[in-house]
């Protein structure tokens, strides 16, 4: 059994509302198919894969259904964390109900909790910048509020790990 981590999948979202990563350059051409080929060549069914964020451009769970079905179809048990572009993110209980209702049995939410995977503990929180110069934002952002909230979530996740 192996443990892998991959972030920033940026899958396209719901049919008819897709956002192509090719707008960021030709290197993103056919990215989902290339991801699938590489994943299937490397990841075994009993492996664990952490996907710590920026999973899909979808704006809500229903729009993300196709992308989650794709991820669920890939080998391995997946642990999904929240990234700064995961606007679809809901409460953990809503996401767990959604995953169960759609038969996404290999997907697990990593949020204020921890998992044991072989000889490793998987835990964490969304990363954030400590200063305004490092992150461009739209509108007023309370940096202290964001950093304090994510620090509390990280502490809860670490406490769940011990």
What are these model-predicted stretches?
Residues 2-9:
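Short, hydrophobic/glycine-enriched beta-strand segments
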Residues 9-14, 90-162:
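Conserved catalytic scaffold of divalent metal-dependent phosphoesterases
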Residues 2, 15-117:
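Core catalytic region of metal-dependent phosphoesterases/phosphodiesterases
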């Amino acid at each position: 059994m192996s443990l892998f981590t991959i972030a920033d999948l940026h899958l396209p979202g719901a049919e008819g509302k897709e956002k192509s990563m090719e707008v960021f350059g030709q290197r993103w051409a056919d990215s989902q198919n290339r991801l699938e080929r590489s994943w299937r060549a490397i990841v075994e069914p009993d492996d664990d894969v952490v996907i710590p964020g920026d999973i899909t451009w979808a704006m809500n769970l229903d729009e993300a259904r196709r992308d989650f079905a794709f991820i669920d179809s890939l080998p391995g048990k997946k642990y999904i964390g929240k990234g700064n572009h995961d606007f679809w993110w809901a409460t953990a209980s809503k996401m767990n109900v959604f995953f169960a209702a759609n038969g996404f049995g290999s997907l697990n939410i990593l949020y204020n909790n921890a998992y044991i995977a072989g000889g490793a503990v998987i835990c964490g929180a969304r990363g954030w910048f400590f200063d305004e110069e490092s992150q461009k934002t739209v509108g007023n952002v309370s940096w202290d509020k964001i950093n304090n909230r994510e620090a509390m979530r990280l502490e809860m996740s670490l406490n769940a790990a011990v």
